[in-house]
């Protein structure tokens, strides 16, 4: 089974799915598409550009492996990956059934002609009636070749988080124009609250295009096997419902076995999840496992082996342990910075930590904190409403910062928050200077000499490469990375390091402003621990409010009415912020306490974000 990911992700995001399939005994290739993760970007100007973004190449590679059954290859792709999988199916699978192919052989090789009614008949029977004995031997030899070719195409594909593929196209059978879809078993999985172009799960069940694929005039029923039929006269026939995937088995149901062998089955799943949980939710992954277990008739190999039930999933535990590793990496950098600060080269950078500026009774602080939370809420609303439109327009700028549009969503989110934060910090600085005579910028050592800033940058570089070394170790020994859900970092290609430097130009100012805001909020009458928690709460409050307005209301409406509507704010790419915003507050405070300056925390946070963007997202528009 080939597993692939969506836009601005890498194969790391779907490795949990791959692990669960592999635990059932499947050979699984988890593949990063062109321009994603460690895969090279294809030459966009090349007229031979692969519409599957490398997924077809991965499929061809699978066929070189001697230990797989080449007649039972499946594919599953999420979001953009589902489009890539659909493109690979179009490139690999025949639009002609075996009967169509043999009718064309009879027509083109043996000079036979057929009426429209006759091409609905069995080609073998027609050949037996019309061909001589010698011709029939030749016919059978050609048939064996065609049958082998069809058998070695993709057997099943799941379109995850999308509704692409398997649309009818016109072909010619024995001189007659008819409509056909790729000869391949097909499945779709679209969450009830799926955000984006595919729409919600429920809307797809009643969409005209989906009902046409399933050959039904009534809403498609989820988790039901449909057996579609070939037709020639323009009148689409009604498909046959074979049963619920939970109640019948391909190991014992003859009708399902026959339909799977003919590659005419369709099925759709609508789990109770959002777009980004298609590969992180239990229900969604359980459906993937169950589908391939049934369609490929395989679960841990030998029939005598006890199969592993699709409800037995362990990948989430591993992903939570990856989160522990991610946090440990961050705290490891903190520990190393403490050691480095004792070295005489860096000791001169140690500044006095200023006396706390705010207090619990500081009305200005609480008002500005509330304004920041409101700004976060409005920023979420803006970037989720505009999504893909938030890109750079000038060509040289797009080449200089060349990651795909989801990176721009993160950056513009940070820019807007930084702009709002700059206004709030400016107000706070002016207030404290006039009211208390305190220069906040000077006391937080934002204003310092260049040699100290250079040493902070050097220390941040040492910390970054130490973290990269930790990643290399866990990749080599355990094939893991620092990740949780959509949030993570991974190994990079050489050109990605240069990308990090380019992206740091625009990201560093946001963390300098953030560091000032966080550390100017230290309070005289509150211990540092509780104060950090307050700052983390302020940074996350607007995000949580947007989540409540968008998703909780959708969930409540669904629970009350059974109608699953589209969340008003499509987080999709913003889920990492639930970890990042409070984590960056924590790091900004800890690094400030160690150095007495906001610079080191800003450099380290910038390095983490650039590393995440340039390693774990994608650049498919420009060859690096």
Q: Model-found features: residue ranges?
A:
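Soluble extramembrane regions of membrane proteins in the secretory/endomembrane system
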Residues: 1-315
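Juxtamembrane/start-of-transmembrane alpha-helix segments at the extracytoplasmic/lumenal side
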Residues: 312-326
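Short, Lys/Arg-rich N-terminal segment immediately upstream of the first membrane anchor
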Residues: 311-316, 354-360, 447
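Conserved helix-loop functional segments at active or binding sites
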Residues: 64, 342, 401
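Lipid-exposed faces of alpha-helical membrane segments in multi-pass integral membrane proteins
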Residues: 324-333, 462, 466, 470
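Alpha-helical transmembrane segments of integral membrane proteins
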Residues: 367-624
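Juxtamembrane interface at the cytosolic side of transmembrane helices
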Residues: 328-371
